[in-house]
């Protein structure tokens, strides 16, 4: 019983020390009132670059290693041109343009650049949960897309745009198709939706695990407290019985025996 109490106290000290050392950032909605109770969970900073399973996650809020992200897809294999501007990486790939009936014949060998840009709004610390502050880089080898960040200024400069806006904190993604294959647009929308659903599922799993741990700890502490209360009650009853027995003995014992007990108190104890 005492070993469990000491272990629980040690765990409590470690948890409180960790929470004091980490710099905590509270997530407060813009329309929140001052007297509104604080949220159950708080946001803590994570490393700018870390791995989760077989995925490598890079946080680009502070302009870290965005321009050094693995050179994917390889230029020598897919013959692609990688350009970076305004925190956006755009990958171009040439493929034959479909033949159309026009006044002047167009050769089938002519090629045109097709650029597809994934546009994502810059997350705000006070509105977006911690898992949504880390941008997810979607890599599509078929359509050659490696983009992230705020692409408002870049999208206006591209001749043939294929824009996809993915907001992971609200309703499903809205896809605007200006030119291109509808099948590819549908596949990209499914990919973005699946990614968003995966992030939400991971968040739910983490919350459920934390709730389960909290529930187990709460029940364990309550059980230990009840055991301690029962032990204290038994000891108090035993103490009262001994006091009553001592009082009766003092009243009925002879003065000689009482004097002998008082003189040899240490031996009796």
From Swiss-Prot:
Q: List the disulfide bonds.
A: none
Q: Name one Pfam family in it.
A: TSC22
Tree of life domain? Eukaryota
Listed transmembrane segments? none
Ranges in coiled-coil conformation: none
An annotated GO BP: regulation of transcription by RNA polymerase II
PANTHER family, sorted? PROTEIN TSCT-1, TSC22
Question: Which family does the similarity line name?
Answer: Belongs to the TSC-22/Dip/Bun family.
Identification of the protein by name: Protein tsct-1
Q: Which organism is it from?
A: Caenorhabditis elegans
């Amino acid at each position: 019983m005492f070993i469990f109490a000491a272990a629980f106290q040690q765990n409590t000290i470690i948890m409180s020390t960790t929470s004091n050392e980490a710099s905590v950032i509270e997530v407060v909605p813009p329309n929140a009132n001052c007297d509104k109770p604080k949220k159950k969970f708080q946001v803590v900073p994570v490393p700018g670059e870390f791995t989760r399973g077989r995925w490598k996650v890079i946080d680009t809020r502070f302009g870290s290693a965005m321009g050094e992200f693995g050179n994917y897809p390889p230029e020598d294999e897919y013959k692609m041109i990688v350009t970076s501007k305004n925190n956006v990486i755009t990958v171009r790939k040439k493929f034959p343009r479909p033949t159309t009936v026009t006044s002047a014949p167009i050769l089938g060998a002519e090629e045109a650049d097709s650029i597809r840009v994934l546009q994502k709004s810059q997350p705000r610390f006070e509105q977006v949960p911690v898992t949504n502050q880390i941008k997810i880089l979607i890599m599509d080898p078929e359509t050659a897309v490696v983009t992230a960040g705020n692409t408002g200024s870049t999208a206006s400069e591209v001749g043939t745009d294929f824009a996809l806006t993915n907001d992971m904190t609200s309703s499903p993604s809205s896809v605007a198709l200006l030119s291109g294959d509808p099948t590819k647009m549908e596949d990209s929308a499914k990919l973005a939706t699946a990614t968003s659903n995966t992030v939400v599922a991971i968040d739910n799993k983490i919350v459920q695990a934390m709730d389960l741990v909290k529930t187990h700890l709460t029940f364990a502490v309550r059980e230990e407290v009840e055991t301690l209360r029962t032990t204290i009650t038994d000891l108090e009853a035993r103490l009262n019985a001994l006091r009553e027995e001592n009082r009766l003995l003092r009243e009925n014992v002879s003065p000689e025996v009482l004097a002998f007990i008082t003189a040899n108190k240490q031996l009796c104890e």
